Amino acid sequence: MAEIKTLRAVQPRANRPQEFNGLYQIPTLDEVIALAKSQSRLSGRTIGIYPEIKHSTYHADLRNANGRRQFGRHYFENRLLAKLHAEYGNSECAPVFIQSFEVGNLQYLSKKTDINLVQLIDADDVNADGSISLVPPYKQPYDFVKAGDTRTFADLLTADGLDFVASYADAIGPWKPYLVKTVADNIDRNGDGAITINDRRVDGSTGVLELAHAKGLKVHTWTFRNDASGYGFADPQAEMTYYYDLGLDGLFTDFADTGVAARDASTNTGSNIEACGRHGRHNRQHR
């Protein structure tokens, strides 16, 4: 920890402001929670946190020079839960979502906590026709690869796949092009003389969002940026509003002011968002 605290954050994107480089340390989970709670008190509204568990399978297999496991299975999951339960309680109404691209760690957590769990979904890219590009090693959760499970991220977005996800998670977090179909048809729609991802034709919902809601899962997606807009959209606020209008429950953006404006401009009233604890695995438990 002392070594990590010698590091300072820098802005990796050259087109963004650089004046804060070197001013701030890498925050710990304790510090993030303390900040969220203090700002909740100051603002009079609840500010949550959204931690991601990274590379559970890799860390579980990691060994030292003597061949002994350095951490073992579920070391980080257990430590995270101990902290979150101490700070927020073991409650489905806690202002917390725990996310992961792996499956096994979320299945383990689902037996240990009522805090909301999110199955992240990513792969390689999207093809020209808007379908999910499934290229190894990115096409599967890493724990599936290690276990010899042939299912891909795309399989998790089918009706059967979402039923499976809803057995242990409360929400899905697919990359945004997996929710809205866009097609590369070589038309310069914004007239800038170049064909980019912004020029892709928007063909509406892929159906994943609606199917996930039908399975009782919330849907969050990522990442929206003013300076790097997305597939089929040149205007970042219009892009986010489009997703909200489809019924999206939440999104990640580097530009919160644009995200709030997009949400407020949406026709989505939030009626698709059920009461606390009535989605995913919790929805099944309450039936």
How should these model regions be labeled?
Residues 1-156, 160-161, 167-169, 174-179, ...:
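Metal-dependent phosphodiesterase/phospholipase catalytic core, i.e.
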Residues 282-286:
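Extracellular glycan-recognition regions
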